[in-house]
């Protein structure tokens, strides 16, 4: 039996705020930029939060074609992909095989780097939290292609919509270089719309300044 499912970005933002996943303020990023917000998906560490995130991923996947296997990069992507497989089954009556990778290859038992469903000859969607520099995604894409997979696309929780070292964002660079789609559940624009709706003018002004300086 399936239940109606419709991901609500505002509800997800509110949950992220309540869990400390999303914070507004001043945060120095690895790039040296001082960001007016910070997003840490590792704090989506309870059943309700993980369930809402997985619902979002599942809803997105139902709009995508060619979903043979879903894949979660180690380590953070592993619970995300497992929960998404459950959400697809429970909310959409769609049973999708899933897998993940190890950080280090195993030389005993089943061995290798990949765990779970076979990706050989399959169209695979990668599920992760964010794409910051794109390094991790590129590594996973290489692993999957070496195993015979075709990369159908990538799903992330947040698109920061800001430039990297050049004029493109990390997501745009990945899309251009790897020629695959990347979809996000929420974007920086969604965060700004949320602040605007809540009348948080000071935080919104800081977001707008940051967007003008670094946005795409």
Curated annotation (Swiss-Prot):
Q: EC?
A: 2.4.2.10
Molecular function GO terms recorded: magnesium ion binding; orotate phosphoribosyltransferase activity
Q: How does it assemble?
A: Homodimer.
- Its pathway? Pyrimidine metabolism; UMP biosynthesis via de novo pathway; UMP from orotate: step 1/2
Q: Which NCBIfam families match?
A: pyrE
Q: What is the lineage of its organism?
A: Bacteria, Pseudomonadati, Pseudomonadota, Gammaproteobacteria, Moraxellales
Report residues binding orotate.
38-39, 132, 160
Classification via InterPro entries: OPRT, Or_phspho_trans_dom, PRibTrfase_dom, PRTase-like
What protein name does the entry list? Orotate phosphoribosyltransferase
Catalytic function, reaction form = orotidine 5'-phosphate + diphosphate = orotate + 5-phospho-alpha-D-ribose 1-diphosphate
A single GO BP annotation from the record? 'de novo' UMP biosynthetic process
What does the entry list as the binding residues for 5-phospho-alpha-D-ribose 1-diphosphate?
A: 30, 75-76, 102-103, 106, 108, 128-136
Q: Which UniProt keywords apply?
A: Glycosyltransferase, Magnesium, Pyrimidine biosynthesis, Transferase
Species this chain originates from: Acinetobacter baylyi (strain ATCC 33305 / BD413 / ADP1)
Q: What does this protein do?
A: Catalyzes the transfer of a ribosyl phosphate group from 5-phosphoribose 1-diphosphate to orotate, leading to the formation of orotidine monophosphate (OMP).
One GO CC term on file: cytoplasm
Q: Which cofactor does it need?
A: Mg(2+)
Q: Name the family the entry cites.
A: Belongs to the purine/pyrimidine phosphoribosyltransferase family. PyrE subfamily.
